[in-house]
UniProtKB/Swiss-Prot annotation:
Protein name: Microcin B17-processing protein McbC
Family assignment from sequence similarity: To R.leguminosarum TfxB which is involved in the processing of trifolitoxin.
Signal peptide start and end residues: none
InterPro entries the record matches: Bacteriocin_Proc_Enz, Nitroreductase, Nitroreductase-like, SagB-type_dehydrogenase
């Protein structure tokens, strides 16, 4: 047992079973089913498609008409604009496992080998969100044969083998069967919550903090991906139970929260 390893049995000992049951019940209300090969595309929005643009990229004023706003000079802005999310991914070019490792260690691990602080905040330093690496393309160099799903250990900076499912089945589950829109990404990260780890200290509040932590994590991955030349897209259009089963995850303990695809976006080459 490594010095960083935590037994879930210990965490479960301090978890209120009633809180756990209520949070799980609430969580599954957000589960989704997306299998386009069996049905039309599923839309959860009540807004007609023709009207959606009216609601996108807008601001809400809390006191409209009652007070004038104070403008801030755009000269203060020194950050770069976020690159657009990738679509129509293409795996024509080989991707080295070294590039993937570079993403993982810079997005989720400290540059100081002796530090336990990660690049994103976590309530109570509990870090209840786990990152799983899923290979989706055979066009990856130096990937160890036999395993296509790994669990990333950010303190050890190591990969734990989890599942041996083939890349086609894995991509079908993560994409919700909607691979035509996405194209051919090289790999994906799946962010999963360990319920007991999120709840044992802060109870219901811990669930909220875990969801916010997930956003910090994938935004960090966005920033690193931009720097190393990877395109990415955050994706929620998948069937939760199907993803968990394909990845060999015990849904009584852990659940996928969001998927993030990575790779090249390479014009028309993959459409030929």
């Amino acid at each position: 047992m490594s010095k960083h390893e935590l037994s879930l049995v210990e965490v479960t000992h301090y978890t209120d079973p009633e809180v756990l049951a209520i949070v799980k019940d609430f969580h599954v209300r957000g589960n989704f089913a997306s299998l386009p090969e069996f049905a039309e595309r599923t839309f959860v929005s009540a807004v007609p498609l023709a009207h959606l643009e009216k609601f996108e990229n807008k601001e809400v004023l809390f006191r409209p008409g009652f007070s004038s706003v104070i403008n801030i000079s755009s000269s203060h802005n020194f950050s770069r604009e976020r690159l657009p999310s990738g679509i129509n991914f293409c795996d024509k070019n080989k991707l080295s496992i070294r590039t993937i490792e570079k993403l993982l260690v810079n997005a989720f691990s400290s540059p100081d080998p002796g530090s336990v602080r990660r690049p994103y905040p976590s309530g109570g330093a509990l870090y209840p969100i786990e990152v799983f690496l899923c290979r989706l393309s055979e066009n990856t160099e130096n990937w160890q044969a036999g395993t296509n799903v790994y669990h990333y250990l950010p303190l050890s900076q190591a990969l734990e083998p989890v599942a041996t499912c083939n890349t086609q089945s894995l991509y079908r589950s993560l994409s919700g069967g909607d691979s035509e829109r996405l194209g051919k990404p090289h790999f994906a990260l799946v962010y999963c919550i360990i319920f007991e780890k999120a709840l044992f200290k802060y109870r219901y509040r811990g669930y909220r903090m875990a969801l916010m932590e997930t956003g910090s994590m994938y935004q960090n991955a966005v920033l690193v991906a931009d720097q190393i030349g990877l395109k990415n897209r955050v994706w929620a259009g998948y069937t939760d139970s199907y993803v968990a089963k394909t990845m060999n995850l015990d849904q009584r303990t852990v659940a996928p929260l969001i998927v993030q695809f990575f790779g090249d976006v390479n014009d028309d080459k993959c459409l030929q």
